[in-house]
């Protein structure tokens, strides 16, 4: 029941911004039901093909190169493996060559459909401009896929149903949750950090957790009795003494 135009635009920016090389980039969309998935892929694919790719400092460029040749090879290797595993390569970004930058580390926007949970393109963090579409047949199945994933940094639900949004936000085992927000990075006075394999250290970064990280706790236990009495105290009660 999501606004499809909004969901498609959100996926574009969240998946392909910074060439997908950021910890909060989305790498998978769980489109509930085949009709929803068909409409989503049909609307998204031409936008991915139309991405303007080049040097980041060139006017109008929407996506630049990945960081190293090794990253380019690794990302294209994931696309290769996804295709071998049975995913539909709807938009293929492999082998992209730009005039004047033939040796550049460019990978075009890639869209994979009919991905399944056992595929490495879904299980692993690719850190590249690759978006996988899975097709769970119900809300419960989609939520369970998120719950079962190894990583738990961020997730989002796109819906007009407030009950579904509330259920998702309260029950999901993910550190940062968006409701109709594709990249749920909170403002600085809230904590930033994931759960499960996406957790780092024992505190999150921002908010009160950040203050705690830079705080060394000290406990002081004191009494100011009315008069000093002799004798040992054998319990923790401040008002009881045994002489």
Summary of predicted features, one role per range:
Residues 129:
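Glycine-rich nucleotide-phosphate-binding loops and adjacent flexible coil segments
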Residues 82, 133, 155:
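A short acidic/histidine/glycine-rich donor-binding loop in glycosyltransferase catalytic cores
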Residues 122:
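Short, solvent-exposed loop/beta-turn-alpha elements that line the ligand-binding surface or hinge
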